[in-house]
Curated annotation (Swiss-Prot):
Keywords assigned: Late protein, Viral tail protein, Virion
A family per Pfam: Phage_T4_gp19
Lineage, opening ranks: Viruses, Duplodnaviria, Heunggongvirae, Uroviricota, Caudoviricetes
InterPro entries, sorted: Phage_T4_Gp19 (IPR010667)
Molecular function GO terms recorded: structural molecule activity
Purpose of the protein: Plays an essential role in tail assembly by capping the rapidly polymerizing tail once it has reached its requisite length and serving as the interaction surface for the completion protein.
Compartments, record wording: Virion
GO cellular component term of the entry, any: virus tail
Entry protein name: Tail tube terminator protein
Subunit architecture: Homohexamer. Interacts with completion protein gp15.
């Protein structure tokens, strides 16, 4: 079988990831309980320019900036709510509505890393570092007596960031 065909059948699995927030005791429970995280969407915005001999046409050209969707992480809320409290404290460290302090991004971690693992979950295939992250949104956490079983409580954190860098084989992918 050719190598191209082997690569087609060797698909990645949705569970091949680890979210890491280095040097952050506040968010350790969140990191351990991360359940799902997509690689955020990125785009180059379209710039409309005039075209045609009389300037009556419109051409779409690539813009000169990148736009990033936020990092969305769904996590399990543990029995003592440490994972939720850690994220709430991170939010308060960014903009504290109780004290009026607004430290912006000074108190949070420098970056978050999303590690994509191979199918054996022993080797890192790719890393994405999200720089200057901050929590903008925590979803609701619903308690309910109407469930037949005892499902896990989940919460979703929306984490904007300034930019990200993709690392593959020890090198930052910066240009083609």
């Amino acid at each position: 079988m050719s190598q191209a065909l082997q690569q087609i059948f060797n698909q990645a699995n949705t569970t091949n990831f680890v979210v890491s927030i280095p040097h952050s005791n506040t968010t350790s429970a969140f990191t351990l309980n991360a359940q799902s995280v997509p690689i955020p969407g990125i785009r180059i915005p379209v710039t409309d320019t005039v075209t045609g001999p009389f300037g009556l046409g419109r051409a779409q050209r690539p813009g000169v900036t990148f736009e990033y969707d936020p990092l969305i992480v769904r996590f399990i809320v543990d029995e003592e709510l440490k994972s939720w409290i850690g994220m709430y404290e991170w939010m308060l460290g960014t903009s504290n509505y109780l004290t009026g302090e607004n430290t912006a991004q000074k108190t949070g971690p420098e970056y978050i890393t999303l590690y994509i693992l191979d199918n054996s979950k022993t080797e890192i295939v790719m890393s994405i570092n999200f720089y200057k992250p901050w929590v903008s949104d925590l979803s609701e956490v619903e308690f309910s007596y109407t469930e037949d079983s005892d499902p896990a409580l989940v919460c979703t954190a929306t984490i904007p960031y300034t930019y990200f860098q993709v690392e593959k084989d020890g090198k930052i992918i910066a240009e083609v």
